[in-house]
Design a protein with these regions (language model features):
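Catalytic loop of short-chain dehydrogenase/reductase
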Residues: 93-94, 106, 125, 138-161, ...
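Conserved glycine-rich cofactor-binding loop
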Residues: 8, 15-17, 39
Length: 250
């Protein structure tokens, strides 16, 4: 199992929901954290909580729909002088449900792709060469089970594009200890998922981070969190390595 104690991880969208739970879990494993949100005030609570667990942590802020803000955030992270060995691209934006799908505005696609595809891709491209140079690293991109839903076409298309980027990048790190995979929390009762969702946010732990801990050299696969609900981290990793092959397959 990949060891994260003392390593540094970037978690986007860490202030609430799945990102918040992910930050707490990773801190419990001894992982140092860089926590992203749109505003530094949003991460004050989680920053204090993870630091209380004895790890080092920093907060950064950026509007992921603004490429210049993403680039500024990456420069700020570089200025910290730490090696980011783990990237969890958790942040996402879900657009309105368009019952009249033929009236879907172009803006749905524009904002969805900026936040859900372009920003995580830029983050991947920034850190992946550094990981390859050091010979180790993990990138986990959060996708969605929403597919073939024309009423949420902008969102589903942006996640499908992220899936493709992840698979393609995975082929470039074959044979190394740098792994890049996909995760999906499932439909959870968060601000994004809504109150009607069937799954508690806590059900996504530890599955949402299983792709960080797998250590079998396989990239480009889908490791949906609900497949590992109720398991220990060790059992989740064993299941992932035994049952989930590459490339991507749900």
């Amino acid at each position: 199992m990949y060891q994260v104690k003392g390593k540094w991880a970037l978690i986007t969208g860490a202030a609430r929901g799945i990102g918040y739970l992910t930050a707490k879990f990773m801190a419990e494993q001894g992982c140092n954290l860089i926590l992203h949100s749109r505003n530094l005030s949003h991460t004050e609570k989680v920053l204090a909580e993870v630091r209380s667990l004895g790890i080092s942590a920093h907060a950064v802020a950026a509007d992921l729909s603004d490429l210049s803000a993403v680039e500024a955030m990456l420069r700020e992270i570089d200025s910290l002088g730490v090696d980011v060995d783990i990237v969890l691209n958790n942040a996402g934006l879900q657009i309105a449900y368009r019952t009249d799908y033929c009236a879907t505005p172009a803006e749905d696609y524009e904002i969805s792709f900026r936040v859900n595809t372009i920003a995580p891709a830029m983050i991947c491209y920034h850190f992946l060469p550094k990981m390859i140079s050091r010979g180790t690293g993990r990138i986990l991109n959060t996708t969605s089970g929403i597919a073939l839903d024309v009423c949420q076409a902008g969102y589903s298309a942006s996640k499908a594009a992220l899936d493709k980027i992840t698979i393609d990048l995975g082929s470039k790190v074959e044979g190394t200890d740098v792994l890049i995979n996909l995760t999906d929390p499932g439909w959870c009762r968060t601000d994004l998922g809504g109150s009607q969702a069937p799954n508690a946010p806590e059900s996504a732990i530890p599955g949402i981070v299983t792709g960080v801990f797998v250590n079998d050299g396989k990239s480009g696969r889908y490791l949906g969190a609900q497949h590992f609900a109720g398991m220990t981290l060790e059992d989740a990793v064993k299941k992932a390595e035994a049952e989930f092959d590459s490339p991507y397959g749900k």
